[in-house]
């Protein structure tokens, strides 16, 4: 994959891609995300990293057009984690869950051509183990005792 692209955001709200030396749109940034191209967006005034803010703008545009990914209830539940004792744990949980989902999506696509039933069984077992580990982490973070699990061989 290519090196990290730097995009500058100027006070006039325009985005400038320093790699291709031209102004780009949020749709272009979305294309970078979809292609897996690493990038950072920097505020031109002070070089602060505003990548998350730009990604949230893209998500907002996606959510307002077409079929939304998040329900209002789901968004409200996520907001309730801000400032709480489990905010960091919840963030790691979401990131781990998304990473797992993406990896499994790739594995399923690749493996279904070989042995569909064996693949689904193996992924299901792996999924159960990962969810159990994440549940244990949440319980520990909340201060509940967690009994050690026996790992299947």
Swiss-Prot record:
Sorted alphabetically, which InterPro entries does this protein's record hold?
Answer: PHA_DNA-bd_N, PHA_reg_PhaR, PHB_accumulat
List GO BP terms, alphabetically. Answer: regulation of DNA-templated transcription
Taxonomic superkingdom: Bacteria
- What is the name listed in the Swiss-Prot or TrEMBL entry for this protein? Uncharacterized protein Alvin_0064
Coiled-coil zones: none
């Amino acid at each position: 994959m290519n090196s990290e692209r730097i995009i500058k955001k100027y006070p006039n709200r325009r985005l400038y891609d320093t790699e291709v030396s031209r102004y780009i749109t949020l749709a272009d940034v979305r294309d970078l995300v979809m292609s897996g191209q690493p990038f950072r967006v920097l505020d031109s005034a002070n070089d602060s990293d505003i990548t998350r803010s730009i990604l949230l703008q893209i998500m907002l545009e996606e959510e307002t057009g077409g079929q939304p990914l998040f329900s209002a209830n789901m968004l409200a539940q996520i907001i309730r984690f801000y400032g709480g004792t489990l905010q960091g744990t919840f963030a790691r949980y979401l990131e781990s869950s998304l990473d797992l989902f993406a990896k499994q999506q790739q594995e399923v696509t690749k493996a279904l051509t070989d042995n569909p039933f064996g693949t689904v069984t193996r992924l299901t077992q792996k999924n159960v183990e990962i969810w159990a580990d994440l549940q244990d982490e949440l319980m520990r973070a909340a201060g509940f005792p967690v009994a050690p699990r026996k790992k299947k061989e």
